[in-house]
Amino acid sequence: MKVVIMAGGKGTRISSVASDIPKPMIKIEGIPVLEREIKCLKDQGFDDIIMTVSHLGNIIMDYFGDGSENSPATGKPFGVHIEYYFEKEPLGNAGALFKIKDKLTSDFLLLNADAMFDVDFNRFVAFHRKRDGLVTLFTHPNSHPYDSGLIVADKNGAVEKWLAKEDARPQYYRNRVNAGLHVINPKVLEISGIDADSVGKIGEDGKPVKVDLDRQLLKPLAGTGKMFCYDSPEYVKDMGTPERYYSVCSDYKEGRVSGKNLRNKQKALFLDRDGTINKYVGFLRNIDDFELIDGVAPAIQKINESGYLAIVVTNQPVIARGEVSFDELEEIHNKMETLLGKEGAYLDAI
């Protein structure tokens, strides 16, 4: 399976860390984050890579070459095959896909080059193939869902709604965010209605035609039954700001990055709900009665930072008693996730 890595961002938000190199070349413990991505892929058999580059892209191309040489950082072979598409003009974060579409003849992985991750990609791809959809999104909870795009899906993982940052959202929602890793069938490019030849050319508005991955290619598939989400607690973190970069550095040093890969056994804390997370009110039937216990969010935040999974296991007899429906219970849990997210905490599963 081919891997397309989007490495064309300017990284203006993280320029204080390194302004003279592309964001994917910023180092984590002496090795560029992009090299760590490539090693994670190569170790799992994904060694056929296309990189889309633009801003300072020559630095990336000079460093990795065609993937057949040794790493300047480690002295070890990259062990992959790399091709490049250089954007002379910005095409948006998905415009380059239309320029390389002849090379994309079957499902491919599409990844961002500026995220730190350690993921079981074979498990991810197997999920995609089992669902037989056009797209599978890698989704996870994060510590700031209030300013992130949210994915709403049914119980089978079919994406029903894609709520971008600017979209109106319900009062309470599940903390499920697109992590920027995707498996995509190239048919998505065909059905988008976008003319590949027009991308990069001057449009009717006098500006070059660009393509936005989320808004123009993926979001329109919500509700069609052709796009699914793959929920995973594995480590994927954007390094777009200095704060997040230093957080990633700390996580790597402490072993939290590799430790979250689902090829490894996981450490977890299982939490009761009533009286542990929310104030005990007996049989909780009304969503308005759900209130977090003071100090719970900071405590769960410490679990999130520890490398342990935070999983809620709760017995709800109000279901058996017919006093609360499954949909109403889900809304109560959405409130729990929303309130925790507002304080920077999240649950890996309920």
What do these predicted regions represent?
Residues 31-48, 296-307, 335-342:
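A short, N-terminal amphipathic alpha-helix
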Residues 265-311:
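Active-site neighborhood of HAD-like aspartate-dependent phosphohydrolases
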Residues 47, 106, 134, 309, ...:
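Short acidic/polar active-site loop segments enriched in Thr and Asp
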Residues 131-141:
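A short, conserved acidic/glycine-rich loop-to-beta-strand motif
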Residues 1-19, 263-274:
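N-terminal nucleotide-binding beta1-loop-alpha1 segment
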Residues 2-5, 27, 31-116, 121-123, ...:
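Conserved N-terminal catalytic core of the sugar/cofactor nucleotidyltransferase
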Residues 52, 296, 300-336, 346-350:
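Substrate-recognition element of Asp-dependent hydrolases with the DxDx(T/V) motif
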Residues 108-109, 116, 122-129, 142-143, ...:
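Catalytic-core segments of class I nucleotidyltransferases/pyrophosphorylases
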